[in-house]
Amino acid sequence: MIPTKKIEFEKKRKVVECKKCKGVGCDACIGYCIYIDQMAEAGIPVDYWYRNIEDFYGEDNFKNSIIEYINNLNEEYRKGITLCLVGERGRGKTFAACAILKKAILEKFSTTYTTICDLIANITGPNPEIRLLIKEIDFVVIDEVDQRFFPTVLSMEFYGNQLENILRSRMQNRLPTIMCSNSPDISQIFGGEFKKSFESLGSQFIKILPAVGKDVRLNKEKL
């Protein structure tokens, strides 16, 4: 959840910095402020609001694959494939996933960004509407799908079952899901029935896109 004060600060800043109206307010400012509200509502982290995929410093093949996905967004929505961005830290997985969501917002699709921990906390909480909502949103990004958040076998199986239920529903309804993980094989994170289901659905509904190259953050470059 993005703090309200931060949202209002960013909207005010964009108006003040507007070269068209020089802070007075214009259609361009209003449009961008609406866009900021939409990114915030989707849960896209502020750090990625103003970053463009064209300026991505990571590995070229990964970058070009994401640009191709964005340029063919309507076709990707039609296919409804689950896209798994896998690779070590600092390779631009979250950057890429958020770039897809920002384009989806502009194309009038419903979107949401969440981490696996927040997702599980919400869908296992007292509000059952959240589970239904996450199954109906057009484009969903699930970040930080990693084993380190599930220290025991029981927690791995429990959370795996919750995620499997959501993914199966979205796959069957051809709704795109983008998952980001530091693990090269997401199916191994949860094991059990999730692993079997993930492997069974993989050939038809899942695409693995490796994010390789160097850790850009260590070189103080912007992802």
Kindly give the residue locations of the regions a language model identified.
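Short, surface-exposed polybasic-and-hydrophobic patches located at secondary-structure transitions
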Residues: I66-G80
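Short glycine-rich substrate-engagement loop in P-loop NTPases that contacts/grips substrate
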Residues: K63-I70, L101-I137, F149, V153-E157
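Walker B catalytic acidic pair
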Residues: D143-V145
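Residue-level preference for the first positions of well-ordered beta-strands
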Residues: G80-C84, F139, P176-I178
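Short loop/turn elements that form and flank the Walker-type P-loop nucleotide-binding site
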Residues: R78-K79, I134-I137, R170-R174
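A short, basic N-terminal segment
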Residues: M1-E68, F205, G213-L223
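Walker A/P-loop nucleotide-binding motif
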Residues: R78-A97
